Amino acid sequence: MPELPEVEVSRMGITPHLLNQTIQSLIFRTPKLRWVIPSELKKLQGQVIRHIGRRAKYLIIETDVGSAIVHLGMSGSLRVLDADFPAGKHDHVDLKLSNGKVLRYNDPRRFGAWLYAAPGEDHDVLGNIGPEPLTDAFDGQYMFEKAQGKRVAVKQFIMDNKIVVGVGNIYASESLFRSRILPTRATMSLSAEEWQRLVSHIKQTLQTAIEQGGTTLKDFSQADGKPGYFAQELQVYGKAGESCPECGEAIQELKIGQRNTFYCSYCQC
């Protein structure tokens, strides 16, 4: 599943091709992805794209009459192509531009979404969510205070979008390993110093992943079709049974909150 770095990489990749361009047409080849595609999106035809933003794992394509809100789901990707490039089997949405390009949304599993928000309004999917992890609002003190009285496993806690957005499964496992914190520990058991260390590693891991173009394990590709290269930096995720890069012990795997979790029982405590 594309996580925050992959969505941010997509935003950075498409922005030079979309910004200040006019949307000539929107083409939908399916009526429904995860949710029904709203008819209000057709209002964006003929409008100039003013800004391409991101909140959590949602891309926001802004015009004067409203915004398209895009979620990549489990297997979605966005590519910028020549407008006459033939559409493939899983190419469900085209946003044709005045510069002769098309923003094409591909999603084999159809778990993604294209939604509409009126000017100045936030869509319900963006309500009641936590701060962005790469901002100053996300720090060790904030997490220490949020953690008080919480018995849930720390990995599950940092993946809760109501606490902080965008820390997905890959980056949660990697950040906990780099922080030397066991993913099963009760959230409230972490000290203020441990929270500061974990927050620092979350920020570093996400930023490095963005700089590496994200992580391609199966479906994700950048806007130019290239894979992300952070997979080469993974230390524990997907490596059950392999040797820990720090101590040589076998990397362990278990499920926390129905998500596969990877860790070193010797290095993490």
From Swiss-Prot:
Keyword set includes Lyase: yes
Q: Which UniProt keywords apply?
A: DNA damage, DNA repair, DNA-binding, Glycosidase, Hydrolase, Lyase, Metal-binding, Multifunctional enzyme, Zinc, Zinc-finger
| Highest taxon in the source lineage | Bacteria
SUPFAM superfamilies given in the database record: Glucocorticoid receptor-like (DNA-binding domain), N-terminal domain of MutM-like DNA repair proteins, S13-like H2TH domain
Q: How is the cofactor bound?
A: Binds 1 zinc ion per subunit.
- Zinc finger region(s), FPG-type: 235-269
Query: Per the entry, which co-factors are needed?
Result: Zn(2+)
The family classification in the record reads: Belongs to the FPG family.
* Name of the protein in question: Formamidopyrimidine-DNA glycosylase
Organism (species): Vibrio vulnificus (strain YJ016)
